[in-house]
């Protein structure tokens, strides 16, 4: 009986550990690649100047916090059907924050 309980407990703990992508270290290189392939072109059109980075650095930016940046990346992913996994969203968020926003975690 104890062995079954311990096995069940181990299984639950392992499942919990594998289901916590938010604790994983973001892959900045992947975030940059995704930004260049799936975000830059649309942002370049929206800026009106052909520079996709301008949307991140404009003075009237809607992004005022790291939490807001995460929401904006998720919104773009959903609305534009970019097919990004949650880990990819985290990578893009981390890249944009490091490159442009510099919000404290």
Predicted features, each with a name:
Residues 19-34, 81:
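Electrostatic cytochrome c docking/interface patches
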Residues 36, 44, 78, 97-101:
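Residues at helix-coil transition
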Residues 36, 66-74, 89-93, 97:
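An amphipathic alpha-helix signature
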Residues 82-105:
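C-terminal capping alpha-helices of c-type cytochrome domains
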Residues 1-10:
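Bacterial N-terminal signal peptides that target proteins for export
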Residues 28-32, 40-74:
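Gly/Gly-Pro-rich "capping" loops immediately C-terminal to redox-active cysteine motifs
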Residues 9-19:
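Bacterial N-terminal signal peptides
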Residues 61, 77-80, 86:
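Long, charged/polar, soluble alpha-helical segments
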């Amino acid at each position: 009986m104890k062995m079954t309980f311990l096995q069940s407990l181990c299984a639950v703990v392992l499942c919990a550990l594998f289901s916590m992508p938010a604790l994983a270290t973001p892959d900045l290189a992947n975030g940059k690649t995704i930004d260049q392939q799936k975000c830059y072109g649309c942002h370049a059109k929206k800026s009106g100047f052909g520079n996709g980075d301008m949307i991140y650095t404009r003075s009237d930016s809607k992004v005022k916090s790291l939490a807001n940046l995460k929401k904006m990346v998720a919104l773009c992913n959903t609305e534009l059907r970019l097919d990004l996994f949650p880990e990819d969203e985290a990578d893009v968020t981390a890249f944009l924050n490091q490159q442009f926003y510099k919000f404290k975690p």
